[in-house]
Amino acid sequence: MVAPRLCEEDMIHLTNITRQHGTHILFKDASFQITAGSRSGLVGPNGAGKSTIFRLITGEENLDGGEISCNKKTVIGYFSQEVGEMSGRSALAEVMAASARTMQLGDEIKAMEAAMCEPMEDDALAALLEKYGDAQEEFEHRGGYDLENRAQAVLTGLGIGPEDYQRPVESFSGGWKMRIALAKILTINPDVLLLDEPTNHLDVESIVWLESWLSTEFTGAVVMTSHDREFMNRLVTRIVEVGNGTITTYGGNYDFYLREREVRREQLLASHRRQQEMLAKEEDFIARFAARASHAAQVQSRVKKLEKIERIEIPAEQKVIKFEFPEPPRSGDDVAKVVQLAKIWPVEDGTDKSVFGGVSGLIRRGEKVAVVGVNGAGKSTFLKCLAGQTEPTSGTMTIGANVNLGYFSQHSMELLDPKKSVFETVQDAMPMASIGVIRNLCAAFLFQGDDVDKRIDRLSGGEKSRLVLAMLLAKPINFLVLDEPTNHLDIQSREVLLEALKNFAGTVILVSHDRHFLRSLVNRVFEIDHGEMIPYEGNYEYYLQKSGHENY
């Protein structure tokens, strides 16, 4: 049972808010509202202040000006990328513990019910009944009657099944702890969900479940940031853009926002041109007749008019970024062939775990292939076998003639020397190259000017991803094996990588949970299912239709 939500007037109002970090103004005198049941996407360049808005709403940061007001009964749930310490509980207990107030209310209600069975004065009973009614109302509002069932359903939806409910939370890896942290926030059943990159570390199945849950089960308001374009498009009905010191709202999803933003900018540019033409005429008149006494009144009038005109300013546009892979050397027609490939990993308890067996397939020159499958199917392991990062347990694998393979994974970023600069790192990958060639390659992957002197330990996840890709291209690669290349990249950077891969004349095989990326890029799909590989001779849409995953 889900309690009724807040009524229309119970919104979060952000009124004339101002926040700055040092001398840098994030936004000034900005206003917007979060209405009951609304679905908003928060967008803007890195460092614009998106996460700051979340922290201002939760009270983790203070305003420099303005006001944020909301009903005192409003329950806010905030999911961030800062997981915090988790230990000493099972996965289910950890999720339930986040609803401590709800559980406390349940205990209080039971205690009051027991107390009502005891004789007491009428006044005391009346006071107890009033307190009992208030507690019961809040307990119902928080969804207390189905708390444990909800916690289990959310954990299962995020890929942690009943067999892992009682598993110690500290035994989960970082990515799975992120899922538990997300489950905690969803289970709270808040009035307002603030979600900062909720799809990070989720596979496609969990992303689809989360979309469905937010669409059909959760009736509160949602404000989210996400680098997953399709996730954003399917859920939000309003975009709140943070940038250039302002906050601007657009009705519609992310794709609508992109179109509408361009229309508004063109209109602003046209208005700016007209105003500049008018100002030039007025200033010309003033300059020509300023010295003539007969026109003194007119000149003075026009000077005052100009002083009162509010100048139209054109906000600085985000720099359009683009990189492209150099023309690769031509490989043979058959790039890679696997026959009855199998992989078994040893487990800590001394047993063996079969990841996949009987996997066969052929990758041809120029193909863009996606490897898909449920979490744990062996997608990343298959790519590791292809890239020579691990040996298959059995079967044969043949890399074709003149194939130069480049491999990208999240582990690649961990191997970077944190004390070296971007320039030094690329130089290590191509020691015979001139300074100019190295700088050009760095620039192609958006490291320009002083950026090449940044130390690795100061780079963001997205910057590290770009650097590893740049190092791949330091050699004449014609076969790219990419394991989650879009992780840590924002939407704009994903679009840049997408265009570069679409124009890449070589061969690509990749694992990605970004459905927009897959829809736009791949022309063939390998699905690993129950240890076997099924080829689909068509694009991602074709695969979804043939495999019965149309809702993806």
Task: Indicate residue ranges for each PLM-predicted region.
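ABC ATP-binding cassette signature C-motif
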Residues: 2-273, 319, 326-552
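Short intracellular "coupling" helices and adjacent cytoplasmic loop segments at the cytosolic face
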Residues: 118-121, 286-297, 313-314, 446
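Extended non-transmembrane interhelical loops and adjacent amphipathic helices
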Residues: 129-132, 202-203, 300-310
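ABC ATPase nucleotide-binding domains
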Residues: 268-290, 295-307, 319-320, 324, ...
